[in-house]
């Protein structure tokens, strides 16, 4: 059975089209045979043709639902409705090897790159640890079972959709500061997951913040340097190799003074 890949493509302004189409330049390196579905979201004028052509070149199905969504809402909806395992994939990912048939031991239900807790510059929050959604494998059936089990532990569970609560971005004020649960962080804290092994991590890189660099640049001390890295990768995707080491150093420098649970 072919693996499934879902991509949410957002182009808020024409200047971000490179970040929105980068993944398609190496997508079939990462997923040679997978069934790829791309959902359009918030397309700036003039960007539709570029996205449609990028999808055509890699034989990806382009879906245009006609409404705007948010990344976390989109993920939650997939988890609530899908019946087969799938990959989430961001548009600012570069592949260097195949991600198909990784052969993770045991019975995994969520596999991704571990992102440690760090002090987030843009929101001035403590960004809690999670499995990063830039490239995340999920088994929706097993995850729904895990979430139901987790939710049943409460004597009077609230009448809400637990999956949405755990997947949606959430800000939690505490005496020590605001905790930012980014997309899927609550799910990881509630039911856990599997950290992607090193031999899988070396097969891709992710351009952090590439699709929203314009929004956070005023808060970043090294915004010009980050933008230059992005520019070089758009020029030649192979230059993305090794970016993970720099991101790890960023996390180390901005690690919270206490462990976040």
Segments the model singles out, each with a brief description of its role:
Residues 96-176:
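Conserved catalytic core of nucleotide-sugar-dependent glycosyltransferases
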Residues 144-232:
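Catalytic core and acceptor-binding pocket of nucleotide-sugar-dependent glycosyltransferases
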Residues 84-96:
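Short beta-strand-to-loop acidic/aromatic patch adjacent to the donor-nucleotide binding site
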Residues 13-29:
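Short, well-formed alpha-helical segments that are part of the catalytic scaffolds
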Residues 12-17, 44-45, 93-95, 142-145, ...:
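Short acidic, S/G/P-rich loop/turn micro-motifs used as interaction or catalytic elements
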Residues 39-82:
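Active-site-proximal specificity loops/subdomain of glycosyltransferases
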Residues 3-5, 27-38, 60:
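Short loop->beta transition adjacent to catalytic acidic/histidine clusters or analogous donor-positioning motifs
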Residues 2-12:
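Nucleotide-activated donor-dependent transferases that construct or modify glycoconjugates
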């Amino acid at each position: 059975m072919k693996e499934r890949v879902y991509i949410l493509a957002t182009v808020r302004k024409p200047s971000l089209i490179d970040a929105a189409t980068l993944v398609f330049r190496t997508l079939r390196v990462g997923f040679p045979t997978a069934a790829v579905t791309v959902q359009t979201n918030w397309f700036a004028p003039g960007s539709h043709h570029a996205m449609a052509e990028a999808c055509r070149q890699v034989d990806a199905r382009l879906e245009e639902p006609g409404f705007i969504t948010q990344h976390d809402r989109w993920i939650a909806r997939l988890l609530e409705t899908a019946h087969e395992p799938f990959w989430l994939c961001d548009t600012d990912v570069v592949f260097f090897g195949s991600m198909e048939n990784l052969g993770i031991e045991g019975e995994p239900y969520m596999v991704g790159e571990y992102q440690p807790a760090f002090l987030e510059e843009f929101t001035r929050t403590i960004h809690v640890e999670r499995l990063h959604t830039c490239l995340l494998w999920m088994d929706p059936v097993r995850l729904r079972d895990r979430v139901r089990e987790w939710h049943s532990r409460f004597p009077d569970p609230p009448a809400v959709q637990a999956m949405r609560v755990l997947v949606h971005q959430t800000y939690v004020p505490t005496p020590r500061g605001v905790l930012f649960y980014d997309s899927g962080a609550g799910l990881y804290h509630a039911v856990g997951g599997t950290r992607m092994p090193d031999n899988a991590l070396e097969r891709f890189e992710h351009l952090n913040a590439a699709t929203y660099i314009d929004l956070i640049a005023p808060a970043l001390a090294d915004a010009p340097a980050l933008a230059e890295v992005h520019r070089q990768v758009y020029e030649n995707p192979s230059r993305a190799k090794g970016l993970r080491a720099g991101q790890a150093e960023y996390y180390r420098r901005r690690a919270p003074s206490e462990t976040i649970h």
